[in-house]
Amino acid sequence: MQNSLPTQTYQSQLNEKTERLQKMMAPFNAPNVEVFSSPEQHYRMRAEFRIWHEQDALYHIMFDQETKQRIRVDQFPVASQLINQMMVALLAEIKDKPTLRHKLFQIDYLSTLSNKIIVSLLYHKKIDETWQQEATALRQTLIAQGFDVQLIGRAYKTKIMLDNDFVDEVLPVAGQQMIYRQVENSFTQPNAQVNIKMLEWALSVTENSTGDLLELYCGNGNFSLALARNFKRVLATEIAKPSVHAAQYNIAMNHIDNVKIIRMSAEDFTQAMNGVREFKRLEGINLQDYQCETIFVDPPRSGLDEKTVELVKNYSRILYISCNPQTLCQNLETLIKTHKISKLALFDQFPYTHHMECGVLLEKR
């Protein structure tokens, strides 16, 4: 599976997901599913591998989820071509360098469509200046081979970055080039081509919007920055510090002046909106000034908690992106009492797996 993909089954697995999603949504009177496919291979922009040492040899491995057996991975067609090229080049360079290979147990890759890559080397040992010198030489060698690479070393309570711990992605979204800073070890959408389709779908279903947009869990601003052109103003919340910093950078780089990011959890924001308590982080922002008629949510796999469901149902339109249709359905049992589903989409973020990413637009009855 890891060294080859059953590309001949791509369409049939997508059809099966489409039928499954349509059945799940039938109790909620959902319209027909709009389907957005993925490239059949080289679609995943990040990958993590354990490293196996066998005498002088060194190779990437993964573990079979059922048998737990290790699988040697020399090529990984799931991942971007850039990751595949780097996998080969990197191991060729470090296998003869004891400082770089000793107790190396994992390598993480994060690549972009803009042809940049971050490589994180994880060790079960202390890494120091000697490691840094060797890693710097390694990076220069890889740059000379044509790679635009950031190299990071990680060990217990240690992180050494040779230059930056981020890369800037450029995505073409509905005729505009959007710049997104992606930070190592922070969440980014794994399938860039499908992410573009998700952003364009969200833009199309919110065309001719009135009022402002509220977004919970905004990450690096992936959706809020793309959607800013459809709304007067956007107010977005995010809890993770690196993501908030990346979002602020992305706002500046994309010359967007109508988006405000607040660092707080969806739960705290719910309390602030309901006037339960005041928060220092909201100083200078009067929530009453915003006329948010649309709310956008892209929650974790667990879905929206009860209090957030109570918050979102107050909005005329709810745009909900879900990476777990089961928890979406649980939330819909409440939301369907006040709203109807006007749009339904399936995004094949994770081909050849049972995972489904979907989007619904709910409008007040």
Curated annotation (Swiss-Prot):
GO terms for cellular component: cytosol. It comes from Proteus mirabilis (strain HI4320). Belongs to the class I-like SAM-binding methyltransferase superfamily. RNA M5U methyltransferase family. TrmA subfamily. GO terms for biological process: tRNA methylation. CDD domains: AdoMet_MTases (cd02440). Dual-specificity methyltransferase that catalyzes the formation of 5-methyluridine at position 54 (m5U54) in all tRNAs, and that of position 341 (m5U341) in tmRNA (transfer-mRNA). SUPFAM superfamilies: S-adenosyl-L-methionine-dependent methyltransferases (SSF53335). It catalyses: uridine(54) in tRNA + S-adenosyl-L-methionine = 5-methyluridine(54) in tRNA + S-adenosyl-L-homocysteine + H(+); uridine(341) in tmRNA + S-adenosyl-L-methionine = 5-methyluridine(341) in tmRNA + S-adenosyl-L-homocysteine + H(+). The active site is at C323, E357. Gene3D superfamilies: 2.40.50.1070, Vaccinia Virus protein VP39 (3.40.50.150). This is tRNA/tmRNA (uracil-C(5))-methyltransferase. Its EC number is 2.1.1.-, 2.1.1.35. S-adenosyl-L-methionine binds at Q189, Y217, N222, E238, D298. PANTHER family: TRNA/TMRNA (URACIL-C(5))-METHYLTRANSFERASE, TRNA_TMRNA (URACIL-C(5))-METHYLTRANSFERASE. One of its GO terms (molecular function) is tRNA (uracil(54)-C5)-methyltransferase activity, S-adenosyl methionine-dependent. Pfam families: tRNA_U5-meth_tr. Keywords: Methyltransferase, S-adenosyl-L-methionine, Transferase, tRNA processing.
